[in-house]
Each structure stands twice: as structure tokens, then as C-alpha cells.
């Protein structure tokens, strides 16, 4: 399980160094194999260990290619999916087209989200967090049943 937000830097080749606390888990559970794709709702990337991505692919394969909305989701997620292998120094190379989608240049937020990471440009991440907090403060109590049952 991945949690927390960590500032990491991309090097000049577009590689990010995976924080040490995740490396062993990624090596053990995925042999360091990851899949990166775009987030279709936000200007960030989604980074999955290969076994987790294979579950997503199975779900995508069950969508109808005859349904325009389902086909669009398949096209966006699978069409942008890029395999990346963690090297001996714990780095992952993020494809240029993916970095461009999320506006990633130097400082990147690696955000744990249970079974995957989100990769955000640092400035965009802080803006998104502010927007999310502001939206919650303005919310009128329209919580789903699942959120109502969540006790923090």
C-alpha cells in the first residue's frame, strides 16, 4: 500500500528516484516493473506496479469497443500506458509524452494512493490540494453513504 506525498526530482533524462521506503516493496511485488499512464480527469500521471496495472487492463478489456465512451477511456488509458523498469539505482524513466501531459519538469510530487502513485507537478499539486480543501469547506453535506460511514 502506498501513502503519503513526497517531493522528488526528475533528472535531465526524465528519471525520478523512487523513495527508498517503496523500493523493496516494488521489487518484491512487481520486480520493479511499473506502468505509467495519464489520469483522464486531472493533469497528473498514474503509476502502477505491473500486477496492479494488469487488473486494470482486465477491467478495460471487458468494456465494449462499440460504446464510444468506453472506447474513449480504453484509448486514453491504454494508448498512453508506458512500461517502465526501476533500474539498479531505484530510478524510473517517465516517457516524454507523459511528462508533457502532466507538465512535469523538475520538481514532482509522488502521491501514494493505495495501489498506485499519482505524479504531479509540484505547483499544480499544491493548487489541487487547495481546491480540494476549499471544495470540502463549501460542501453542503452531500456525502455518499460510503463517506458518511467513514469515521476519522
UniProtKB/Swiss-Prot annotation:
The principal location of this protein is cytoplasm
Q: Which UniProt keywords apply?
A: Cytoplasm, DNA-binding, Repeat, Repressor, Transcription, Transcription regulation
Organism superkingdom:
Bacteria
GO CC, alphabetical? cytoplasm; nucleoid
Q: Where in or outside the cell is it found?
A: Cytoplasm, Nucleoid
Give one Pfam family.
Answer: MraZ
Q: Which GO terms describe its molecular function?
A: DNA-binding transcription factor activity; transcription cis-regulatory region binding
Give GO BP annotations, semicolon-separated.
Answer: negative regulation of DNA-templated transcription initiation
Q: Which residues form the SpoVT-AbrB domain?
A: 5-52, 81-124
For this protein, the record's CDD domains field holds:
MraZ_C (cd16321), MraZ_N (cd16320)
List, alphabetically, the HAMAP family matched.
Answer: MraZ
Q: Could you tell me what this protein does?
A: Negatively regulates its own expression and that of the subsequent genes in the proximal part of the division and cell wall (dcw) gene cluster. Acts by binding directly to DNA. May also regulate the expression of genes outside the dcw cluster.
Subunit details for this protein?
Forms oligomers.
Record family assignment: Belongs to the MraZ family.
Task: Give the protein's recorded name.
Answer: Transcriptional regulator MraZ
Species this chain originates from = Escherichia coli O139:H28 (strain E24377A / ETEC)
Amino acid at each position: 500500500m502506498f501513502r503519503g506525498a513526497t517531493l522528488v526530482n526528475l533528472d535531465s533524462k526524465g528519471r525520478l528516484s523512487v523513495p527508498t521506503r517503496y523500493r523493496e516493496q516494488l521489487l518484491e511485488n512487481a520486480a520493479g516493473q511499473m506502468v505509467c499512464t495519464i489520469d483522464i480527469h486531472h493533469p497528473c500521471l498514474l503509476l502502477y506496479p505491473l500486477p496492479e496495472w494488469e487488473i486494470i487492463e482486465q477491467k478495460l478489456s471487458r468494456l465494449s469497443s462499440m460504446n464510444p465512451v468506453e472506447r474513449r477511456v480504453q484509448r486514453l488509458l491504454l494508448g498512453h500506458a508506458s512500461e517502465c523498469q526501476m533500474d539498479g539505482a531505484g530510478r524510473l524513466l517517465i516517457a516524454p509524452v507523459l511528462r508533457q501531459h502532466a507538465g512535469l519538469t523538475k520538481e514532482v510530487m509522488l502521491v501514494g494512493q493505495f495501489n498506485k502513485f499519482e505524479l504531479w507537478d509540484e505547483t499544480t499539486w499544491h493548487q489541487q490540494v487547495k481546491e480540494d480543501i476549499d471544495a470540502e469547506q463549501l460542501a453542503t453535506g452531500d456525502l455518499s453513504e460510503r463517506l458518511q460511514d467513514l469515521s476519522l
